[in-house]
């Protein structure tokens, strides 16, 4: 029996996949637990509409992330650290970089910095994952206060 999965199921498939399973497994477990629906022409149409909506949302998310990437890469972020001769006190963390970006942006970016974890004095390139397919390389300048 062919069914459309309504959620991810280990060793079977992911949400919206069409899989072929035994009749008993489909009727007694998957359909009864509302983890799948039987494949019919109507359920196929609903699946196609849902997939089209998901694809449009994904394309819009990529477009938004690309626009944000272009904006972030144009202007560097400036930070200042206290120093005593050659010794610096502290470093710039991921949270400080995210907070600085969120001041200027309408979007809220959380935990997207891929590297590095702490920055000292100097000029650094920080990669920020805005989407699975879009990574912005932001110039971060850390100066003495």
UniProtKB/Swiss-Prot annotation:
Alphabetic keyword roster: Ribonucleoprotein, Ribosomal protein, RNA-binding, rRNA-binding
Record's GO cellular component terms: ribonucleoprotein complex; ribosome
Disulphide bridges, residue numbers: none
GO biological process, one term: translation
One MF annotation (Gene Ontology) recorded for this entry: structural constituent of ribosome
Protein role: Binds to the 23S rRNA.
Family as reported in the entry's similarity comment: Belongs to the bacterial ribosomal protein bL9 family.
Protein name according to UniProt: Large ribosomal subunit protein bL9
Gene (UniProt): rplI
